[in-house]
Structures are given as C-alpha cells and as structure tokens.
Amino acid sequence: MSEQQLLTEREIHAFGIHILIKKLEEDGWIIESADPGADRATHPQIVGHKDGEIGFFVVRTAMYPGKGRIEGEEVFQNQVLHAGKHGAACYFASLGIASAAGESEEAKSTPVKGVHYHISFDGLVRMSLPEPKVTH
C-alpha cells in the first residue's frame, strides 16, 4: 500500500479560498481577484463586488476539529483598516474541513490529498472596529 500524500498548510488555505469563491459566486458576488498567497496579516484573500458594494474577504481554513481563526487583534485591525482605505467592507470566513473518508477523529483531521471533504462554514462575519468613545 502506498503512503498517503498530505495537503500542506498552503494547500489547505487555498482549498478554503476556492470553497469561498464558489459560495460567493452563488450568492451573486463578482470576484475581481483571489490570492491564496496574499500577506495574511494585511491583505484579503478575495476581493469582489455585489450591488455596488466592494467586499474584502479574509479567509482562514483549518482541519477538523478546528475552524479557521484570525491570528490576533492586530491582524483583525489591519484587515479592517486596509479595507476601509479602499472603500470596501471587510468580511471574515472561517472554514473547517474534515476528510469524508475518515472514520476516526484522527482520520477526519488528516489532510489527505485526493479525497472528499466535509465543509463547515457558518457564513460570513462582517468585520468592523468599535466606534471611538467621545469624551467631554
């Protein structure tokens, strides 16, 4: 029996982006660009528009049992500010993937190439910063 080839972190990330692109297109978004290699700390992985709105989409994908997470408050703020500079709304997509062939917890969490995956995606979260407090 041959050894299974595993997806790299970069391939898992790109897979999540591909999944989100399909979902966005189904929802009427026109995709302008998609870059799995974008600097994850400062730039969106997908840029699109719909009904006059520009959307910057920050995507994170993790293997079962996890879900993609933003790497801290500074990254969150950088993404929102970057979108704002371009007149765009900023959205976060957290995806989790599990090997459909996996029967055990370990097998579900192993990123094997060439198998089907179950996708966990609860929708987009609009990212925003709190309004500054006004003091008198």
Language model region names:
Residues 108-136:
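Glycine-rich, aromatic-bearing surface loops/beta-hairpins
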Residues 17, 42, 75-76:
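Amphipathic coiled-coil/heptad-repeat helices and related helical stalk/stem segments
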Residues 36-40:
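A short beta-turn/loop motif at secondary-structure boundaries
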Residues 43-48:
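Short acidic loop-to-beta-strand element that houses the catalytic metal-binding Asp/Glu
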Residues 1-35:
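Acidic-basic catalytic patches of nuclease active cores, encompassing PD-(D/E)XK
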Residues 13, 18, 49, 82, ...:
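Histidine (H) residue identity feature
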Residues 49, 53-55, 59-112:
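Catalytic cores of nucleic-acid endonucleases
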